Amino acid sequence: SVELARRLVALGHSTPALATTIRRFRTAIEIFREANVPVFSELEELAARYQRITGSMTAEWEGQERPLPQLQPFLKSPDRDVRERAYRAATQPYMEERGALSGLFDQMYALRQRAARQAGFANYRDYVFPAKFRFDYTPADCERFHAAIERTVSPAVERVLEQRRRKLAVEALRPWDLAVDPDRAAPIRPFRDSDEFTETATRVFQEVDRRLGAQFKTMVDERLLDLDSRKGKAPGGYCETLHFRGRPFIFMNAVGLVDDVMTLMHEAGHAFHAFAAHAQPLIWQRHPGSEAAELASMSMELLASRHLAKPVGFFTEEQHLRASLEHLEDVLLSLTHIASVDAFQTWIYTSPDGADAAARDAAWLRIRSRFERGVDWSGLERERVARWYRQLHIFLYPFYYIEYGIAQIGALQVWRNSLRDPARAVARYREALALGAVRGLPEIYAAAGARLSFDATLIGELVELVEEEIGRIRGRVG
């Protein structure tokens, strides 16, 4: 709380290891306004309303009312007509609720801009940077990131999607063609049950680094993993830290798919971060920003990827190639999506037209077209607009998204290092995790062997490496 921050700052005690923590406390004190307490309370109520509206959405599918997530498997169907029906059914509720969601966002927008002005800022974008303790990069850096993604990643994504179009043998790639396996291979079932899942994952992490493998084995032995999907279990996946015990806890809903393997690799990265940072004496010294937290998780996805084939890992050689190809293509696709979401939010809160619902929709289409190439949206303008209404971050966690892009660029550098010297790359990765929050973001990235960078030159080098690896894998799978 701000009151606790005031008391701690008033003590006047500081050391180099506490510098980042004290700076965060001072910033929280500086931007706090009593008048904003009811504003943020009202925003929480509006956020709950958004979740009620979207959480209750259903679609009729083959005579049954189904929650929208249950339509996802049909987007992978080899039957294109089935995919199109599933896509339209899943999008329709958002188009029907567009008026309600737009009205809800009108209120959120006004409250956020008011909170920013009451705290002495010109707009909510400018308020967010100190509020999120973004000390090491600026709004201008984010705009450089957008431009770099447009220049280097968007053309690569266009090439990836053109390859998909040719494999699917369609005249134009439509939005319902993006999830299906273009090779129409049999679905991969990497494990049968949670025992096999954890046993295999333990072997994988031991191959990455014996100390990381031992930490994961500790989680298995101490029952700090809840991985199976079951009736009545909350959705999603995450890693939580049990600070008193100095242990992480991983929660997810595994059903035996490739995505489950990648989710566990990701969450294990957070878990290894928790183990390493626990050596820092204070809780505040253990939690860096999301840019560093996601560096830990995204790097582990890539560091572990080389060990996922049998006899150590989950996949046959052919399955491993397919899973690796999908993962690397997803890395590129996600970067363009992240850039478009952040650029859109920047426009909303800095443009005089941000309060206008129609102008927001038009801006989304314009910005989306800037980054997203290779998909034919003709006749689907309303569906394309609906995409931002289901991006819950825009409604619930404004400006919390570019962190994923920044971390992905860092993780790709860690991965590049691992291709040259795997042991050294993992050692530096572990050194970075152990810093917790006692250093700034550039120093944490440097410890991991990466640069905190927003420029097109570095990003272009990494994209070239990813495309080279994609080409190598394609040459082996046909």
Give, region by region, the residue ranges found by the protein language model.
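C-terminal, non-catalytic "cap/extension" segments appended to globular domains
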Residues: 26, 133-136, 228, 264, ...
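Post-HExxH zinc-binding segment in Zn-dependent metallohydrolases
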Residues: 151-152, 288-317, 327-328, 333, ...
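A glycine-rich phosphate-binding loop feature that marks nucleotide/adenosyl-phosphate handling sites
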Residues: 164-184, 218-229, 289-292, 323-328, ...
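Long, K/E/R/D-enriched contiguous segments that form extended
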Residues: 172-200, 273, 314, 319-322, ...
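Glycine- and acidic
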Residues: 31-32, 88-97, 137-143, 180-190, ...
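Active-site-adjacent "gating/activation" loops or surface patches in catalytic cores
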Residues: 66-81, 183, 190-265, 269-274
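A well-structured
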Residues: 1-187, 200
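Catalytic Zn2+-binding segment of zinc metalloproteases
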Residues: 269-283, 303
